[in-house]
Amino acid sequence: MASKCPKCDKTVYFAEKVSSLGKDWHKFCLKCERCNKTLTPGGHAEHDGKPFCHKPCYATLFGPKGVNIGGAGSYIYEKPQTEAPQVTGPIEVPVVRTEERKTSGPPKGPSKASSVTTFTGEPNMCPRCNKRVYFAEKVTSLGKDWHRPCLRCERCSKTLTPGGHAEHDGQPYCHKPCYGILFGPKGVNTGAVGSYIYDKDPEGTVQP
């Protein structure tokens, strides 16, 4: 059964039929609702089920601020090349970042070189004689480098071995008798804050 044209409400036969907006129209009834310009199926805008030409009628009636499209129920069609600038934006960002990475790379080289020069700098100074300590004559104790003959008891001047002596206020002392006499309470070999803890001599227990 033939349908009726929504424009003239008359029967639409196959030979004169065009379909648009989900309806069958007479070919010459498919016109712009405002200017009566004959439209082509799918080549027009729509509002509330009625056809309108894209320009100027639909834009004038329903388009916000002169834009060609807009309003509820309108067909979506191509915009006049507004999205082209968005493509160029992201491309420029990686170029800047790569340049920043290149510039930030070189400064790290000299920092490593300077740290090496500190290790190969001048020898440390002996805390006893305040002279340079070279590798061949160096012994390390109390976190410092000493000349081997300079590592001796602060009281009796006995030559000491690294790690085999007591300490008080950063100065080396022999365990017995000097440290015990100076800082040990009641004749005990060790004592006082800052001293090393070491084993007592078995002979000390025999003596009264």
Swiss-Prot record:
**InterPro entries registered for this protein in UniProt:** Znf_LIM
**Which GO biological-process labels does this protein carry?**
hemopoiesis; positive regulation of cell population proliferation
Which gene carries the instructions for this protein? Crip2
Which part of the chain is the LIM zinc-binding domain? 5-57, 126-178
* Keywords recorded for this protein, A-Z: Acetylation, LIM domain, Metal-binding, Phosphoprotein, Repeat, Zinc
Q: What is this protein called?
A: Cysteine-rich protein 2
GO terms under cellular component = cell cortex
One Pfam short name: LIM
Q: Could you tell me one molecular function GO term of this UniProt entry?
A: metal ion binding
Describe the subunit structure.
Interacts with TGFB1I1.
Query: Which SMART domains does this chain map to?
Result: LIM
